[in-house]
Amino acid sequence: MSFEELWQKNPMLKPRIEKVVVNFGVGESGDRLTKGAQVIEELTGQKPIRTRAKQTNPSFGIRKKLPIGLKVTLRGKKAEEFLKNAFEAFQKEGKKLYDYSFDDYGNFSFGIHEHIDFPGQKYDPMIGIFGMDVCVTLERPGFRVKRRKRCRAKIPRRHRLTREEAIEFIEKTFGVKVERVLLEEEEETQ
């Protein structure tokens, strides 16, 4: 039985996107950080928060607690719309999504080198070019039991997402081809 048939038989097993976190690692504060904030707000439609340096590094001119990056957390429809555009920009760069980008619980990450690859974005010499990391967290309905305040419980192993299931969900939902490298190596060793 394929995952698609299983999801139709029991809709509580169908994965969904919990959140998408977009991270801009600018590496410096000041004017470049404010320009990055404009770009990320234009791409996501949400105001970013500033991430701060954890350590002082004099060779890079970074002091502890100095804002050096930006991040935005997207949920629901905004997350799905952004992810469609992000996959389009990712494939426009000629990159492929590999199965080793997925962890054992179905979460995955990928990077985009230039924000101008997004649909509707043009190069502006005053702003420059920014890259970003996109981290996607997947879950099933019922995962709230591990986060709620009262009667908190663990998610049983049978209800957790697997790497293969997450790959199939992304391929079916967004039409992205995932190159299988890890799965082929595991089959060869057995």
UniProtKB/Swiss-Prot annotation:
Keyword Nucleotide-binding: no
Any single GO BP term: translation
UniProt keyword annotations, A-Z: Ribonucleoprotein, Ribosomal protein, RNA-binding, rRNA-binding, tRNA-binding
GO molecular function annotation: RNA binding; rRNA binding; structural constituent of ribosome; tRNA binding
Cystine residue pairs: none
CC terms in the record's Gene Ontology section: cytosolic large ribosomal subunit
PROSITE patterns hit by this protein: RIBOSOMAL_L5
Keyword Ribosomal protein in record: yes
Subunit-structure text: Part of the 50S ribosomal subunit; contacts the 5S rRNA and probably tRNA. Forms a bridge to the 30S subunit in the 70S ribosome.
Similarity remark: Belongs to the universal ribosomal protein uL5 family.
Biological role stated in the UniProt entry: This is one of the proteins that bind and probably mediate the attachment of the 5S RNA into the large ribosomal subunit, where it forms part of the central protuberance. In the 70S ribosome it contacts protein S13 of the 30S subunit (bridge B1b), connecting the 2 subunits; this bridge is implicated in subunit movement. May contact the P site tRNA; the 5S rRNA and some of its associated proteins might help stabilize positioning of ribosome-bound tRNAs.
NCBIfam families for this protein: PRK04219.1
Protein name: Large ribosomal subunit protein uL5
Species this protein is from: Methanocaldococcus jannaschii (strain ATCC 43067 / DSM 2661 / JAL-1 / JCM 10045 / NBRC 100440) (Methanococcus jannaschii)
Encoding gene (name): rpl5
